[in-house]
């Protein structure tokens, strides 16, 4: 804060300030109870698959999803594929990593997610772009309202697993 000038910056736990978003290769996500909660009862498996319905089926549409953690309308999201600009589209969808790290784990352990952990609502800060190829590398640049820049060179195909996102 400097007089009436207020600035802030999001910092995720266990990461540095430059980790402002996470990317998902939709072609590599098939979210079923068999994949992520294999020990869940049939009713829990059904509940999980209902909650994860947007991610349940395989896709070859070449969409990449970008979860921008502290997004507001003053941010800029820029994506290029082989030098060609792709237009990010803001979508309303559940975060797939949240589904597998919270809901699937609880169902797999024989309990239901609490309302604090269950992804009952969609996320309002996920964008998607449609790539032309399943194996292209995307250059992603996110700039917050204060000019702080975060980048990723997303090599595809990119596997979807909890371990992949711990890196």
Task: Label each residue range with its predicted role.
Residues 1-167:
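Metal-dependent phosphoesterase/phosphodiesterase active-site architecture
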